[in-house]
Curated annotation (Swiss-Prot):
One annotated GO biological process: mRNA transport
Main location, first listed in the record: nucleus
Compositionally biased region (Basic and acidic residues): 205-363, 376-401
GO cellular component: cytoplasm; nucleolus; protein-containing complex
Family: Belongs to the RENT3 family.
One GO molecular-function entry: telomeric DNA binding
The keyword Cytoplasm is assigned to this record: yes
Primary gene name: upf3a
Protein name in the entry: Regulator of nonsense transcripts 3A
Subcellular location: Nucleus; Cytoplasm
């Protein structure tokens, strides 16, 4: 297969080369003067369409043995020209007759890359027949003359002296090094640089002092906080110990407190407690008389039992007294509230009806009035209520809404009625303190007409 392709491509290329040579010969025959002037001979050949993965060494292996040449240059494929990726090579033969042999051999020669793809090569004359000349480098005149260089010899002398000094005392070497560094620094510094350096050092020192002072204050505050916490713990521990001691003492020794009996109920309770105490003492004496032979342990138990009973009785009496005191205080507050409300309503009526109305009403209350609860309010006459309503509508300010009068419950007192009758009202308990009672003045028809 490959041989047939090679024969076919070889015959085709051979014909094209013969045509080119024939054209060259014709041109030479036509222009003999021009040929004599230039005497140009084609000797540079290019091999195109080589595999992109082919290297220069591999190409030389394929082309060997090559006729004599003075120029060989290989150019790999340019990846930017994808998919037309091909390598090429330029060869300049010394003998132009070798070009035909080379063309017959490698024109149409099939190269196979590492992937198994076939690339038939093409042999042509290069479009540019000139060959780039290699630049010859000038030979350095000082090459191989380093040992004769005076600077190199001076370096060797200094190096040998340094080796001798290294064997000397290290302290002297250190002093010499410090002296050299000082000299170098003195050469590089100026008064302005020294001033700036001193300023920086001063600022750094002040900063460090402030930092130390801040750290010291923080430590002092922390120590004070720890001390306060410790003192607080000690105080709490002492209080706890004292409380425990008080508790233990109260458990061991029960203190008896005597309180005064203020009320009659308290006297009754105290008498009852005394009776119980006397009976308890009689029982104790009864049991103690024949108990001369009993143990002291029984007597201690009886004493503790009596003390507990006494404490319970005293606690009960105390609670009862506190309850009575609270009841009295509530009654006092209620009476004060009723008095203040009556005073407020009196002032309001004076401003509303006039000062004489309240005085007349007070007189009527003294001679003809009596108090009653809401159950007796229906006994008012229809005419009286209409007269009172019409009077209020005439006198009061219509821009201001009427306020419903509120009067608290009746107090424990006796009032005389118009028919020389006495109405005794029972005392109001705290449970019925919320009930509202009202006072109404009822007079005779003549008195009403006189008021109008």
């Amino acid at each position: 297969m490959r041989s047939e392709k090679e024969q076919r491509t070889g015959s085709r290329e051979r014909g094209s080369v013969e045509i080119q040579f024939r054209d060259c010969q014709d041109n030479a025959a036509v222009n003999p003067k021009h040929k004599e002037e230039k005497k140009e001979i084609f000797s540079k050949v290019v091999i195109r369409r080589l595999p992109p993965s082919l290297s220069k060494d591999q190409l030389q292996e394929h082309l060997s043995p090559l006729p004599s040449f003075d120029y060989f240059e290989f150019f790999p494929a340019d990846q930017s020209l994808y998919p037309h990726l091909f390598s090429r090579a330029y060869i300049n033969f010394k003998n132009p007759e070798d070009i035909i042999i080379f063309r017959d051999r490698f024109d149409g020669y099939v190269f196979i890359d590492n992937k198994g793809q076939e690339y038939p090569a093409v042999v042509e004359f290069a479009p540019f027949q000139k060959v780039s000349k290699k630049k010859l480098k000038k030979k350095d005149a000082k090459a191989g003359t380093i040992e004769e260089d005076p600077e190199y010899r001076r370096f060797l002398e200094n190096y040998s002296c340094d080796e001798e000094k290294s064997m000397a005392n290290p302290e002297t070497l250190l002093g010499e090094i410090e002296a050299k560094t000082r000299e170098l620094i003195a050469k590089r510094t100026t008064p302005l640089l020294e001033y700036i350096k001193n300023k920086k050092l001063e600022k750094q020192r002040i900063r460090e002092e402030k930092r130390e002072e801040r750290r010291r204050r923080e430590l002092e505050k922390k120590r004070q906080r720890e001390e306060e916490k410790r003192k607080r713990r000690e105080e709490e521990r002492q209080k706890r110990k004292e409380a425990e001691k008080q508790k233990k003492l109260s458990e061991k020794e029960i203190k008896i407190k005597l309180l005064k009996k203020c009320d009659r109920d308290d006297d009754v309770d105290s008498d009852r407690l005394k009776d119980k105490g006397d009976s308890g003492e009689t029982e104790k004496n009864r049991w103690e008389k024949p108990g001369g032979h009993t143990k002291s342990k029984d007597s201690k138990d009886n004493r503790s039992q009596m003390e507990n009973d006494k404490e319970q009785r005293e606690g009960h009496g105390r609670r009862q007294r506190d309850k009575d005191h609270r009841g009295r205080d509530e009654e006092r507050k209620r009476q004060r509230h009723h008095y203040e409300f009556d005073k407020f309503m009196r002032r309001k009526e004076e401003t509303k009806w006039g000062k004489g109305y309240c005085q007349d009403r007070a007189k009527k209350d003294q001679h003809h009035g009596y108090s009653y609860c809401p159950e007796t309010g229906d006994k008012l006459g229809k005419e009286d209520r209409e007269d009172m309503g019409s009077r209020k509508e005439r006198i009061r300010n219509k821009d201001r809404p009427a306020m419903q009068l509120y009067q608290p419950g009746a107090r424990n007192r006796k009032r005389m009625g118009s028919g020389n009758k006495t109405f005794d009202f029972p005392p109001i308990s705290p449970e019925h303190a919320g009930e509202h009672c009202y006072k109404t003045v009822i007079g005779t028809g003549s008195e009403k007409s006189a008021d109008e």
